[in-house]
């Protein structure tokens, strides 16, 4: 590993032939040059940063022309890794772009570090407290919150979070956080954000194999993403009231854990039969969505690392988007495009809502064997807990939250993707 500060410059000319056809980087006495000859220039910078990091270069200076906000951020996305120290001397930016870069570094790096944290270090209550700390660091005067924990969840009829989390020695937690910059306690709520915060998912009695369990410290990625999104929106100047609900629990095996055949009775009257304890994320989100629906906000967004089916469809490159509201879905896709993040809308139709049959309850927590659209039926399950599910509700299945191994653009671990898109959407909705 080199300890000298390496200069990194950008060029729109191809590399000399000795570096190979279509070479992305070349070196000389002045440092490393990134050659931007493809249409995907931000992606090229990110891939080049991975190569530079892979060569053991950990201290760099972005030099020369072309280093705007998005180019600088693309470099950091690729350069950053989950272990070891890295430092960047940033190119000069206009004041507003410098502020935005600093906010992304603070908030999105928090999201990535939080998702990467070992489950031993990050239980349900700690996740909730860390979320409070982040939002207080950004706009503490506008933040109030309530933590409901353990037996209090049962007594207050948060049946999903309590049931999933009761098998762990670490108590389940619901964080209800109110971001209200208006100063008016009666101000209307513009949006509610509901995040899945499963701090470790063993699968419960529907036990995962090790190959599928080894990344389950990241099963709280939805909660971290929405916390970061609210923090970034606040840092960018959001003036409307938003409520954040983090549904936090461990899904473990024990003598007190929930079992197949159990029936959960929710506060909105729905009953759910458990046919797979590894479909637990939707069970905790249901409690948060019930609370969110009671706020009568025109916008509800939930985010969760919910299904393997979404990853099968989209890989780890895109987040999956589901909604009955075409206009709102398009608004999110517009926000994603403007923030250079990848989302893809997957099907969600009224008939999916009837594909969760149970002989003993109103709903099954997994689709019947004849229905194989697992990501769509998971979204449909959630719709039963949103009062006005046909309008103003978005579900994000966070398939791009975490990578088990490095690829050409990303190190192993959390990506932070989705934070900017949701923050952008909140600000866009606030202008309407």
Swiss-Prot record:
One of its GO terms (molecular function) is metalloaminopeptidase activity. Binds 2 manganese ions per subunit. It is found in: Cytoplasm. It is an enzyme of class 3 (hydrolase). The active site is at 208, 282. GO terms for biological process: proteolysis. One of its GO terms (cellular component) is cytoplasm. The keyword Kinase does not apply. The keyword Manganese applies. It catalyses: Release of an N-terminal amino acid, Xaa, from a peptide or arylamide. Xaa is preferably Glu or Asp but may be other amino acids, including Leu, Met, His, Cys and Gln. It comes from the Bacteria. Pfam families: DUF3663, Peptidase_M17. Signal peptide: none annotated. Keywords: Aminopeptidase, Cytoplasm, Hydrolase, Manganese, Metal-binding, Protease. Its EC number is 3.4.11.23. InterPro entries: Leucine_aapep/pepB, M17_PepB-like_N, Pept_M17_PepB, Peptidase_M17_C. Mn(2+) 2 binds at residues 196, 201, 219, 280. Its cofactor is Mn(2+). Mn(2+) 1 binds at residues 201, 278, 280. Probably plays an important role in intracellular peptide degradation. Homohexamer. Belongs to the peptidase M17 family. This is Peptidase B. It comes from Yersinia pseudotuberculosis serotype O:1b (strain IP 31758). The gene is pepB.
